[in-house]
């Protein structure tokens, strides 16, 4: 079968392309921007890519077109598919029909930590010899791809609440039919498609409706939004984490690089790993609980986590110049920003300065839904540098005025780099946060710092 994928260079759609190729299909695809590393990864799999959406790419017609959720009516290829009656399907629906239908699906949903927790579960299963399949919204550090078929019944998936396609506005995750469901947390996000928090809760309720009765739902009992969703109806077995739950963690050191696992008040495992931060400790606990549901002991799961390497862009050190470290993180929501800064502070101690650099790039950020929460979320930074994107209906200067620490902002990346370079001191740590490429600011900072004559 020849399958053509519209929007192929997104992490999820690229993962589907890899899976389709592994099934033996002839796979082609197109995207508005065909660029590494995804383009390189796909071409290495023998997948032919086209830049742009000229409808001639559909001549001769493929057997099936998988349409990404970034596509909309008016796209030349979408119009050609509809006009010529070419069979089409959404990515999540294809994944269900051709991959997940007969698998034991372990799904990780929630506002934060999906990629990390999914990667942890996949690595635990891999380390324990279970060779799982997976689709994850990033390349886990212990693997070299973001998706694979696997050689066992188990399939791990990052379960996103974003919509499936222009013709299917249901959340992606309702297609996945999980037997083991991890709910990390729940906050309002994706303001471009959800009117309010209740609309998000409704989709999570729909997800709970399709978990089998003998399946397992694992969730943190202290999360009030998830508690409300569970209260809307849950027909499956449950396990909870937190002070009143079955599962509990306890830090053995301040940065949470060592911690113990308790199950029903008994210590059942200890973890000592390369990650830091209480948010990662929480993610690790959820992964251990999920692994236990499929028969892996907490001790074996913890042993695997000791060797876990996170996906890129999760507090990733991009370089050190003249004693100044530049970190990169995917954080783009106030809760994630606060957690990342807290983790970095615990990692470097209380004496070194943190310079936080933020691009409000996500759709929710662009709409200004969370702008009033940004200043408090940045409180652990010693200085803040904000990028002002064009074409958003609010000004980052409003956030700057609400911050208690020194703040500078600019609408020009070069100017922003110059500001940071002028302010930096020996031993400082620069943390760049964005869910996009941020115009290559990380390398621009490293290049600028390399020419800097620091004055102590």
Model-predicted segments: where are they?
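ATP-dependent carboxylate-amine ligase
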Residues: 1-38, 43-49, 60-61, 65, ...
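Fold-independent oxyanion-binding glycine-rich loops
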Residues: 8-9, 30-31, 52-53, 68-70, ...
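Phosphate-binding loop of NTP-binding sites
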Residues: 19-23, 43, 56-60, 69, ...
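Beta-strand->loop->alpha-helix junctions that form or flank phosphate-binding loops
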Residues: 50-53, 91-96, 134-138, 233-254, ...
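A general structural signal for well-ordered alpha-helical segments in protein cores
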Residues: 74, 78, 179, 226, ...
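Short acidic-hydrophobic surface loop/beta-edge motif
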Residues: 147, 259-261, 316-321
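Acidic-glycine-rich active-site phosphate/pyrophosphate-binding loop
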Residues: 251-269
């Amino acid at each position: 079968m020849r399958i053509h994928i519209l929007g192929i260079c997104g992490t999820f759609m690229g993962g589907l392309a890899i899976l389709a190729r592994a099934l033996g299909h002839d796979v082609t695809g197109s995207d508005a921007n065909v660029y590494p590393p995804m383009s390189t990864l796909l071409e290495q799999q023998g997948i032919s890519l086209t830049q742009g959406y000229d409808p001639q790419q559909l001549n001769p017609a493929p057997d099936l077109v998988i349409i990404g959720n970034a596509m909309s009516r008016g796209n030349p290829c979408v119009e050609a598919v509809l006009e010529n009656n070419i069979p089409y399907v959404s990515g999540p629906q294809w994944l269900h029909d051709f991959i997940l239908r007969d698998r034991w699906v372990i799904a990780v949903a929630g506002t934060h930590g999906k990629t990390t927790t999914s990667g942890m579960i996949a690595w635990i299963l891999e380390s324990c010899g279970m060779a799982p399949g997976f689709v994850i919204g990033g390349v886990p550090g212990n693997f070299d791809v973001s998706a694979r078929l696997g050689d066992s019944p188990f399939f791990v998936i990052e379960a996103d609440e974003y919509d499936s396609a222009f013709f299917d506005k249901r959340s992606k995750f309702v297609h996945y039919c999980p037997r083991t469901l991890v709910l990390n947390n729940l906050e309002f996000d994706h303001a471009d498609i959800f009117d309010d928090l209740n609309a998000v809760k409704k989709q999570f309720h729909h997800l709970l409706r399709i978990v089998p009765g003998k399946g397992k739902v694992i969730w943190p009992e202290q999360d009030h939004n998830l508690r409300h969703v569970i209260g809307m109806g849950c027909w499956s077995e449950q396990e909870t984490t937190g002070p009143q739950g079955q599962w509990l963690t306890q830090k053995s050191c301040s940065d949470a690089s060592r911690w113990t696992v308790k199950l029903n008040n008994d210590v059942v495992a200890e973890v000592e790993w390369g990650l830091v931060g209480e948010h990662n400790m929480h993610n690790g606990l959820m992964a251990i609980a999920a692994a236990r549901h499929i028969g892996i002991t907490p001790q074996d799961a913890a042993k695997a986590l000791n060797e876990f390497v996170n996906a890129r862009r999760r507090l990733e050190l991009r370089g050190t110049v003249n004693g100044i470290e530049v970190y990169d993180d995917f954080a783009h929501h106030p809760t994630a920003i606060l957690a990342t800064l807290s983790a970095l502070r615990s990692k470097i101690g209380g004496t070194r300065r943190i310079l936080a650099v933020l691009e409000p790039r996500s759709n929710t950020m662009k709409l200004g839904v969370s702008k009033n929460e940004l200043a408090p979320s940045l409180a652990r930074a010693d200085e803040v540098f904000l990028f002002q994107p064009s074409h958003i209906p609010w000004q980052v200067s409003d956030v700057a005025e609400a911050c208690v620490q020194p703040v500078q902002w600019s609408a020009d990346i070069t100017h922003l780099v110059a500001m940071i370079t002028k302010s930096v001191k020996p031993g400082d740590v620069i943390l760049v946060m964005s869910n996009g490429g941020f115009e290559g600011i990380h390398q621009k900072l490293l290049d600028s710092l390399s020419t800097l004559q620091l004055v102590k």
